[in-house]
Amino acid sequence: MFSIFKKKIVVPHIRLSGIIGNVGKFKQGIDFSSQQEIIKKAFSLKKIKSVAISINSPGGSPVQSHLIYSYIRSLAKKKKIKVLVFAEDVAASGGYLIACAGDEIYANSSSIIGSIGVIYASFGFQDMIKKIGIQRRVYTAGKNKSTLDPFVEEKEEDIKRLKNIQLDLHKDFINVVEKSRGTKLNTKSGIDLFTGEFWSGSKAKSLGLIDGLGNADEVLKEKFGENVVIKKFEKQKSWIAKKLSSGQTNQLERLLSKFEEKEIWQKYGL
């Protein structure tokens, strides 16, 4: 005897949004410790064959990006679950590294994808403190402890040391992309994919950085039918955190955080 009720397919849907790094109590963003339990719960649903992950991030900490990427891949491998990733406005730098945890990656035609590189930025204030008559005093144990001090002239050996670290991080990033995308990468395009450049979703598809165009809702319905049940998993602020973050004592911290986030998002016109 056949049941007249068709069994519905359930797909857990995780959403990761914001700058990647140390989130803290009052900052919006993504880090491993704040997302680990959510990711674990999504992969723990019974009788699922796929997990969907939407990501909207311009990047941030390479370590936190790699921790999240590795955790998703380890759960997917252990539980034999397919991971479908959906880029929203932007999946760039560390955001794209996390996206590489997907067996398939989708994006909007206007999404910003890529930025496979490493950046370090700072300021030099050595002339300013001379003009205003400030004398800087620094005492260290270890000759390289004050590397890249913004209040003294840059040293050639410091820059060389920094660039060597950047090269190591860049190689790690490239290895993740090549492992994830494999033969999907368009190596005949004549475009170097690993210069830090970023592209629209449409161009990223032709370069093999993503698999297709579309949002989570339409792609999941296309794959699993109109009756697919999309169960959302997303970090929620606790009641007490909401109350605390609205207090005046945290206004300066939140304002500085907003300026920092705005600067990173603006790189991609957002």
What are these regions (language model features)?
Residues 1-108, 119-270:
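N-terminal organellar transit peptides
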